[in-house]
A protein has these predicted regions:
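A structural signal for well-ordered alpha-helices, especially hydrophobic packing surfaces
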Residues: 22, 60-63
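N-terminal acidic leader/helix
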Residues: 1-27
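Short, charge-rich amphipathic interface segments used for partner binding and complex assembly
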Residues: 31-61
Length: 63
């Protein structure tokens, strides 16, 4: 499977996962960053984890 195919197939799921992680920010407060890091570490394959990480950056960066 090509990188483009993988990205296309996983993009929606990566966005949902990033939104799920971001939704916990208010609940976890200052512990959120460490929690997110451990959640990202558990994602597989690494290419998918990178997609979720990029989506988190997009969702949290000011416009």
């Amino acid at each position: 499977m090509s990188r483009a195919d993988f990205h296309q197939q996983q993009a929606e799921q990566a966005t949902r996962e990033a939104q799920r992680l971001l939704a916990q920010q208010a609940t976890l407060g200052p512990r959120w960053l460490g929690w997110v890091a451990s959640e990202l570490y558990q994602l597989s394959p690494p290419e998918y984890a990178a997609m979720v990480r990029r989506e988190l950056q997009r969702l949290t960066s000011p416009d």
